[in-house]
Amino acid sequence: MTKTTMHWLAHFQIILLCIWLMCPPSSQAIKCDTCGKECASACGTKHFRTCCFNYLRKRSDPDALRQSSNRRLIDFILLQGRALFTQELRERRHNGTLMDLGLNTYYP
């Protein structure tokens, strides 16, 4: 092997090692029964996050957030922010403070 080939091979191995170290082990993933029996059937789907969010919100237990991984905690926070934003939009539409113009205004 040439010196250049060995150099690139070493870089490639270092990159693979970094990728392997960055991948979280499966033991850190949230378990299907963490969010109650009603969410277990939705495990592995997009609906599971929503179900889990609602379950944790109902429980209002601070320890429930500590049990989830950091990634799930970020998801929880983003879902909570989205829910508050959606609720605010709904209230603005209900109060008439948000103009909801349909496409019919522009395309008769």
From Swiss-Prot:
Keywords, comma-separated and alphabetical: Cleavage on pair of basic residues, Disulfide bond, Secreted, Signal
Domain of life, source organism: Eukaryota
Main location: secreted
Cysteines joined through disulfide linkages: C32-C43, C35-C52, C39-C51
Entry annotated with the keyword Disulfide bond: yes
Chain residues in the propeptide: 57-108
Signal peptide per UniProt: 1-29
GO biological process: one example: G protein-coupled receptor signaling pathway
GO CC annotation: extracellular space
GO molecular function list: G protein-coupled receptor binding
Cell compartment(s), UniProt: Secreted
Biological role: Activates the G-protein coupled receptor TrissinR in vitro, leading to increased intracellular calcium ion levels.
Protein name: Trissin
Protein source organism: Drosophila melanogaster
High-level lineage: Eukaryota, Metazoa, Ecdysozoa, Arthropoda, Hexapoda
Gene: Trissin
